[in-house]
Swiss-Prot record:
Keywords: Cytoplasm, Initiation factor, Protein biosynthesis, RNA-binding
Annotated organism of origin: Mycosarcoma maydis (Corn smut fungus)
Protein name as catalogued: Eukaryotic translation initiation factor 3 subunit D
Stated family: Belongs to the eIF-3 subunit D family.
InterPro entries, A to Z: eIF3d
Chain's role: mRNA cap-binding component of the eukaryotic translation initiation factor 3 (eIF-3) complex, which is involved in protein synthesis of a specialized repertoire of mRNAs and, together with other initiation factors, stimulates binding of mRNA and methionyl-tRNAi to the 40S ribosome. The eIF-3 complex specifically targets and initiates translation of a subset of mRNAs involved in cell proliferation. In the eIF-3 complex, eif3d specifically recognizes and binds the 7-methylguanosine cap of a subset of mRNAs.
Main location: cytoplasm
Length: 579
């Protein structure tokens, strides 16, 4: 019967485990070379007798193929260059064997990556657009010459680089597009709180219907003739000289009067409130100024020229519009793509949205609310646009012992007469198409071909590419108590000309149904607002900035100097005085 005998071990009185002295290894194993390794290394062989420095396989790498790719993969692992000597490489066992295919193949007209690269090589349209603004602080006025753009040339080089440059299997660790913050964080800013979107998405708060406090302004009736506009009967978008005010919260005289009479602690506008409620959908950076007074009241304000004064375009697209590249070698491409940058598209979308609301109303029929427009003065020469301000109070209290009330200034754009002959308040918004083949289009369909026949597909694509903007439209309409929302589809008359636009169609939407279609959770939005309000209520008296990180799904709250924002106002006033 076979017997089992334990092997002899070297005695070691100092350590537990295998011996580590000079006599630990047998004599026949003492001269074997050794290279360091880690447990996560992909070990393919015991030792490399010819090239222990890891500089082997140059010829294999030069040949390319699967072996060269495997060699690049192993560079992501290991503790040092020496460990690459033991990396595993798949050998081509069938290298000496080949089969000749003598069957005839039919050339396909549809190319693969090469055709995609050529398609991407089409040059972007050039030009630059601008818009004119006038009026007092917080006023927005688009005149007859607003949004006029200079025509530019074509830039094929940038399109070729854009179409050919694709992220591959080896570029997973390359840095993605870096965006700039909406405001530069100062060295004297003190971070108070940081909350990521994952935590914000778990918040919930049920809020009851609001209480109306007062209403101001006057509304024009919506012109029903625009319901019959189609792609074949498209109408030109006119540039109409009207004034519409977008005053920030702390400069609103009505809110000052309400804060002196009411016990509410929080004050803001509907644009700020809708942004906070839909914050988890945002991609670009934005900022909100928070001011806490000595009596404990909190005002949420916007910066002049900030994110609240302009609309974004394709913010949520998988490949959103990109800024023009810097450098002399990209100068031609930057000039060609200047009209399709995020900033240029944002200015164009704001111009379109304003003028569409001005154009689709009948100024002969006027509906006046309780009070006159609180921002209009006799010094203004241009007529007022159709706009009404409704001041409403929401109860955000979760406990009776801790009452939290929010006063919001909401806006409606026009009115219409329903079947019951009652006046119904509506909001008027627009979506714009710039170039279906340009970078940043987000796979949008050609509206002139598909809008009439496949409007559902067009709207679904816009919901995907502009999820944040459409969610804000729906929430703002709900906050204002609007019965319906009129949505216009507007496209450039020529993809390379930003000065002329065409109204291709319109549609009626119910704000609550639109919010449900886009999975907008209002209780989650109110939970976000209550969380931010609690942070401001618990903070000390002073000024704060709530900033969305430009490259992360995070918001941060900073304590800033008391004169923050006033420096920019002084610069604007000096420029107006010089003019």
């Amino acid at each position: 019967m076979a017997s089992f005998k334990l092997p002899e071990l070297q005695p070691d009185n100092d350590l537990w485990g295998p011996a580590s002295g000079s006599n630990a290894l047998p004599a026949e194993l003492k001269d074997i070379p050794f290279a360091p390794y880690a447990k996560n290394d992909k070990v393919g062989r015991i030792a490399d007798w010819n090239n222990a420095s890891g500089a082997s396989n140059d010829a294999a790498n030069a040949r390319g193929g699967r072996q060269g790719r495997a060699r690049d993969v192993q560079q992501n692992f290991g503790t040092s260059a020496a460990s690459s000597a033991f990396a595993y490489f798949h050998g081509d066992d069938e290298a000496s064997f080949s089969v000749v295919d003598n069957t005839r193949t039919v050339a396909s007209r549809r190319g693969g990556l090469g055709q995609m690269s050529q398609r991407g090589g089409r040059g972007g349209r050039g030009g630059a657009g601008g818009a004119g603004a006038a009026g007092g602080r917080g006023a927005s006025k688009f005149g007859a010459g607003a949004g006029r753009g200079a025509r530019g040339g074509r830039g094929g080089a940038a399109g070729a680089r854009r179409g050919g440059g694709r992220f591959g299997w080896k570029e997973w660790d390359k840095p993605q597009r870096i965006r700039e913050a909406s405001v530069t964080v100062g060295q004297d800013w003190e971070q108070v709180e940081e909350i990521d979107f994952v935590r914000l998405g778990k918040l919930r708060l049920e809020v009851e219907e609001p209480q109306d406090i007062s209403s101001y302004g006057s509304l024009f009736e919506y012109d029903r003739s625009y319901d019959r506009v189609t792609v074949k009967t498209a109408q030109s978008l006119s540039s109409i000289d009207r004034i519409r005010y977008n005053t920030t919260t702390s400069e609103d005289p009505v809110i000052h009067d309400i804060s002196a009479k009411e016990d509410a602690q929080i004050y803001m506008t509907d644009s700020i409130l809708a942004l906070l409620m839909c914050a988890t959908r945002s991609v670009y950076s934005w900022d909100v100024i928070i001011t806490k007074t000595a009596d404990g009241k909190v005002f949420f304000d916007k910066r002049d020229g900030g994110a609240f004064d302009y609309l974004t375009v394709n913010e949520n697209a998988a490949d959103p519009p990109s800024e023009a590249s810097e450098g002399k070698e990209n100068e031609a491409a930057a000039k060609a793509n200047a009209i399709n940058t995020p900033s240029a598209l944002s200015l164009e979308a704001t111009y379109i949205n304003q003028n569409f609301a001005f154009q689709v109303v009948n100024e002969k029929n006027v509906y006046k609310l309780e009070h006159e427009n609180p921002f209009y003065s006799s010094d203004e020469t241009a007529p007022l646009a159709s706009c009404a301000y409704r001041y409403r109070k929401f109860n955000l209290s979760s406990e009776e012992s801790d009452p939290v009330e929010l006063v919001v200034r909401t806006e409606v754009d026009a009115y219409t007469v329903g079947a019951s002959k009652e006046k119904q308040l509506i909001t008027i918004k627009s979506l714009n198409e710039f170039d279906a083949r340009a970078q940043g289009a987000g796979g949008a369909l050609d509206w002139r071909l598909k809008l009439d026949s496949q409007r559902g597909a067009v709207v679904a694509t816009e919901m995907k590419n502009n999820s944040f903007k459409l969610a804000r439209f729906a929430v703002q309409s709900l906050l204002a108590g609007a019965d319906s929302m009129k949505l216009g589809y507007i496209s450039r008359a020529n993809p390379k000309d930003t000065s002329r636009h065409m109204i291709l169609g319109t549609s009626w939407l119910k704000p609550r149904e639109l919010a449900a279609q886009m999975a907008v959770n209002l209780s989650n939005g109110w939970g976000i607002v209550r969380t931010v309000a609690d942070l401001a209520r618990k903070a000390e008296q002073g000024k704060y900035v709530l900033l969305k990180d430009p490259n992360k799904q995070t918001i941060r709250m900073y304590r800033v100097p008391a004169n923050f924002g006033e420096e920019n106002d002084e610069i604007v006033e000096e420029d107006e005085a010089d003019e």
